[in-house]
Amino acid sequence: MIETSQTIPELVSWAKDREFSLNLPTERLVFLLAIAIYNNERLDGEMLEADLVDIFRHTMNAFEQSTDAIATRANNAINELVKQRLLNRFSSEFTEGLAIYRLTPLGVGVSDYYIRQREFSALRLSVQLSIVADEIQRASDSAEEGVENNESEHYWRRNVFAPLKYSVAEIFDSIDLSQRIMDENQQSIKNEIAELLTKDWQAAISSCERLLDETSGNLRELQDTLNAAGDKLQAQLLRIQDCVIGRDDLYFIDQLITDLQSKLDRIISWGQQAIDLWIGYDRHVHKFIRTAIDMDKNRVFSQRLRNSIHHYFDHPWFLWTAQAERLVDLRDEEMVLREDDALGELPEELQYESLSDLHDQIVEHMQGLLIAYRENNRPIDLSLVLKEQLENYPLSRHFDVARIIVDQAVRLGMANDDLSGIYPDWQAINKRGAEVQAHVIDKY
């Protein structure tokens, strides 16, 4: 068996011979986490059985379970953790009934995953990468010195292999584990967003935006940190690899370098892929929100407005409208439903005018401007045209009029100032504060 890995059959046989197994329901897992937190607060790291019973009682209170026979149930839970090699029990004839307990490496690893490993930030990643860079730098310097002095295998194992194996590789594994925790965090955020949108999407839009932006920012910040250090780390690994090329007795270092390069590539690659996947999900959520808003606008708001009109005399209200022609649509629909004749005349500002007629009028006016340009060589001031035209239409038509004029202006020509990169000044085009930023069209 090589020193850097184990084969699958060997690992299977090893686990089978030792009868490894894990069975941690929520209550047992919470008990283990409580033990780990309590253990961190102690200086000696040792716990008595009475301490564990008190911890068990506290966790059962959180689950609102009965405290009957609490000592027996706590003893059963402790024995299960000992059997699964999560706790070690130490006792002797001198300490009968006063056993001492310590968390095993497995217990520390499981609790560490749920407690400390979730504290993942760009600062922590930067510190880890800084430590890795220092270790690889020392290893590469030692490798070059070993080549110059023709050092023995013992030198290479102590000064090159050991730092890479027991420091760099473990930090890479820690970063990889942190990325997998970030994957879980993304899934939990997706579930939270789905739950928010299912319950009340109107109130949840701001919360969804915050969750999406925070996650996108975290992923981008972490990936930028990885990209900044990745190339330098790869260069140092290549320095070490160049030193062991052709040295059959140092095959274990060459193989370790290859493994580290693969780990680093995988970490950086998955970081970028996670960002791309999250961007796709972000777009999907925004599309869903836009669709939901459109559906609500057509379905809920119109029904609410009809009910308000129907009960107007019982509950009077004021109506502020931004598009007056919508009242005409509502009036026509009511007339069809009731099959009654509408009496009276609409105010002038509510008279219906088709968009095609409006378009033809504006096109005709723009053609007149072209004739003036051809005869007098007079440029077209788009802001002045917009201001003059908007004065002839009600406020409800201003957006459509402005859109048609701008569309026609783009077809007519362009401004020389556009090519020079000069930004035009903002010009007011109506009394409601609307402004436009456009150069004078002087090139056709």
UniProtKB/Swiss-Prot annotation:
Sequence intervals crossing the membrane: none
A single MF term (Gene Ontology): calcium ion binding
Domain of life: Bacteria
UniProtKB keywords: Calcium, Cell cycle, Cell division, Chromosome partition, Cytoplasm, DNA condensation
Family annotation (Pfam families): KicB, MukF_C, MukF_M
Subcellular location field: Cytoplasm, Nucleoid
Region ranges (Leucine-zipper): 212-240
Gene Ontology cellular component terms for the protein in this record: cytoplasm; nucleoid
GO biological process: cell division; chromosome condensation; chromosome segregation; DNA replication
CDD domains linked to this entry: MukF_C
Assembly and binders: Interacts, and probably forms a ternary complex, with MukE and MukB via its C-terminal region. The complex formation is stimulated by calcium or magnesium. It is required for an interaction between MukE and MukB.
NCBIfam families on file: PRK05260.1
Functional note: Involved in chromosome condensation, segregation and cell cycle progression. May participate in facilitating chromosome segregation by condensation DNA from both sides of a centrally located replisome during cell division. Not required for mini-F plasmid partitioning. Probably acts via its interaction with MukB and MukE. Overexpression results in anucleate cells. It has a calcium binding activity.
Similarity comment text for this entry: Belongs to the MukF family.
Stated name of the protein: Chromosome partition protein MukF
Source species: Haemophilus influenzae (strain PittGG)
This protein's encoding gene: mukF
